[in-house]
Amino acid sequence: MDIAIHHPWIRRPFFPFHSPSRLFDQFFGEHLLESDLFPASTSLSPFYLRPPSFLRAPSWIDTGLSEVRLEKDRFSVNLDVKHFSPEELKVKVLGDVIEVHGKHEERQDEHGFISREFHRKYRIPADVDPLTITSSLSSDGVLTMNGPRKQASGPERTIPITREEKPAVTAAPKK
């Protein structure tokens, strides 16, 4: 018995879901663009593919991103956690690593039900004392963790260079 194999990128006229990639285009828990509400255009080509998500408007690329900064006097990490309340977040330091965990159980939003969970780890630089790491959550949902960098012991000083009259190498090279 022969079995027909249907490739998802080939348009099938009687299949009601003409854009198989739309399931993977869902940004779960995020707001929708107008183009997300319309079926994918098959009038251009039967092989039309939706543009990749990284080509979306810049407002879409701020979700879940983190930024690690090592400045002259401090180390800081900024993490977008706008979908989590302070009670749903945990920040802890284990050795030289900051661990961030966020989890919220299933709840209803405007698109249906959603649950989220993430784990992030950040290595603390050697010149930052793990005991000095602090964290705060801004009103727009950015979690900031930072700590001061240790300053070099003592002030900076210039070392003078003296000139000697005798050579550094006293033995003649062997032949």
Swiss-Prot record:
Organism: Ovis aries (Sheep)
Xref: Pfam families: Crystallin, HSP20
Recorded name of the encoding gene: CRYAB
Acyltransferase among keywords: no
Protein name in UniProt: Alpha-crystallin B chain
Residues covered by the sHSP domain: 56-164
Residues with Phosphoserine modification: S19, S45, S59
Residues with N-acetylmethionine modification: M1
Subunit structure: Heteromer composed of three CRYAA and one CRYAB subunits. Aggregates with homologous proteins, including the small heat shock protein HSPB1, to form large heteromeric complexes. Inter-subunit bridging via zinc ions enhances stability, which is crucial as there is no protein turn over in the lens. Interacts with HSPBAP1 and TTN/titin. Interacts with TMEM109; in the cellular response to DNA damage. Interacts with DES; binds rapidly during early stages of DES filament assembly and a reduced binding seen in the later stages. Interacts with ATP6V1A and with MTOR, forming a ternary complex.
Gene3D superfamilies linked: 2.60.40.790
